[in-house]
């Protein structure tokens, strides 16, 4: 009799725990920003700050004996303001990213990035909508990536035509400024069966050219600055309440200081967005690209497909595959990039969220024989201690390997051998607080 009662108590406890867990999972388990209302203008302000400590085992993205590791401190403040008046609303958003390396060898690679975004929406009438957006970012490219991919440190000055940081007087990360403005006009009532969208944008990328750089590297950086002008028109067809089709015609124009690198693209795309079932969603875009460069032309088919499956409220799986033709490098070669990835997001105990993702990227060069492969693995755990206090642990692993590890870079008419490929592990622990 006692054993029977004990089993009943155990079953009751298990049932209570399951019910509590189910209730907790369905509760709001996401970080909540603090919102403050200005009593005079009615503006809404919110801000937060994240501070953390981490470790990077390959700060300069190097191979073998050139690897340097360091622990670091991070600080990421955010600030936003939102306002609305009649049929107009606007938002202004700031994001900062500060990282300080403690290893004296790479302390000069500490950085502070800043990003400012603005948006203005104006409902001109039932069928006329205008959206203006702009962004400005002052950021960096870590050594061993971007324009210095495959560069390395070597004190042997007798070696010629090799891409070393020493030879070009590069002592820390490469500064970069990105600016973009966009104007989008939409014709058609919200929720209508059809809409026409006209979108015009311009983007600038400019590298910081320091006087300390060697003259050839200065010219190299200057020729990497680019202005991109985009124009697109989209016909949006809401086929059913669960399915939408987009038909897009787009023109892109890329301008460099060296006019021989100028090129343009004409793109026709078809997109489908469908809530397939109550637990799954499909987004797919297939496009035909015609690229015209000064010395050659090519055409290809790009795609971007993602499938989201949410079997239960607290667990989501996303599958993604894509292919795109990247902007050509300074040799006139162009790259076809293929990506495949999977992401799993899971919430448990009502206030803990895990995010696990893997992505494989394959970049194939069309003129010279070279294929680059990237494997990226990321894991993060978010513990919501309070609605406005969150602890985060994150880990990132990157493996970059290529079948042509000495493929040269061309700088000011000369070729310089590189050491391509690296392996990197990063992990950190941070706390985020709403202010």
Predicted regions and their residues:
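Surface-exposed strand-loop-strand hairpins of Gram-negative outer-membrane beta-barrel proteins
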Residues: 52-74
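Outer-membrane beta-barrel translocator domains and adjoining extracellular loop/strand segments
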Residues: 58-66, 102-111, 142-151, 207-219, ...
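Hydrophobic, lipid-facing positions within transmembrane beta-strands of outer-membrane proteins
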Residues: 73-79, 114-118, 177-183, 227-233, ...
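Repeated loop/turn-to-beta-strand initiation elements of outer-membrane beta-barrel proteins
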Residues: 87-90, 126-130, 191-198, 206, ...
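Outer-membrane beta-barrel "beta-signal"
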Residues: 383, 389-390, 395, 419-435
């Amino acid at each position: 009799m006692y054993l029977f009662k004990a089993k009943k108590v155990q079953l009751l406890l298990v049932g209570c725990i399951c019910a509590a867990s189910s209730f907790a999972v369905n509760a709001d388990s996401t970080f909540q920003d603090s919102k403050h209302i200005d009593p005079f203008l009615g503006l809404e302000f919110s801000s937060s700050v994240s501070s953390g400590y981490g470790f990077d085992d390959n700060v300069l993205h190097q191979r073998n004996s050139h690897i340097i590791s360091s622990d670091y401190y991070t600080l990421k403040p955010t600030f936003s303001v939102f306002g609305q008046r009649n049929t107009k609303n606007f938002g202004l958003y700031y994001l900062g990213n500060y990282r300080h390396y403690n290893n004296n060898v790479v302390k000069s690679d500490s950085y502070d990035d800043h990003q400012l975004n603005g948006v203005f929406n104006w409902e001109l009438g039932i069928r006329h909508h205008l959206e203006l957006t702009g962004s400005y970012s002052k950021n960096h490219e870590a050594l061993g990536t971007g324009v210095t991919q495959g560069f390395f440190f070597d004190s042997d000055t007798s070696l010629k035509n090799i891409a070393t940081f020493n030879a070009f007087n590069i002592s820390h990360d490469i500064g970069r400024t990105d600016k973009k403005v966009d104007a989008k006009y939409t014709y058609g009532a919200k929720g209508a069966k059809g809409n026409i969208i006209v979108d015009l944008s311009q983007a600038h990328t400019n590298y910081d050219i320091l006087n300390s750089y060697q003259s050839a590297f200065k010219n190299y950086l200057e020729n990497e600055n680019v202005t991109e002008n985009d124009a697109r028109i989209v016909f949006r067809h809401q086929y059913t309440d669960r399915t939408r089709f987009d038909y897009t015609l787009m023109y892109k124009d890329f301008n460099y200081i060296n006019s021989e690198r100028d090129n343009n693209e004409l793109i026709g795309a078809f997109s489908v967005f469908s809530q397939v079932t109550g637990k799954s969603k499909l987004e797919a875009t297939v496009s035909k690209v015609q690229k015209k460069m000064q010395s050659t032309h090519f055409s290809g088919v790009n795609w971007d497909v993602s499938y989201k499956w949410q079997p239960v409220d607290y667990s989501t799986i996303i599958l993604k595959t894509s292919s795109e033709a990247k902007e050509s490098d300074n040799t006139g070669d162009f790259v076809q990039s293929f990506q495949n990835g999977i992401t799993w997001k899971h919430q448990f105990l009502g206030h803990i969220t895990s995010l696990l993702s893997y992505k494989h990227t394959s970049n194939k060069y069309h003129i010279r024989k070279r294929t680059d492969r990237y494997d990226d693995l990321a894991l993060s755990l978010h513990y919501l201690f309070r609605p406005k206090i969150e602890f985060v642990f994150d880990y990132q692993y990157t493996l970059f390997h290529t079948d042509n590890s000495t493929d040269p870079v061309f700088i000011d008419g000369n070729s310089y051998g590189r050491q391509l490929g690296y392996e990197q592990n990063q992990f950190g622990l941070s706390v985020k607080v709403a202010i």
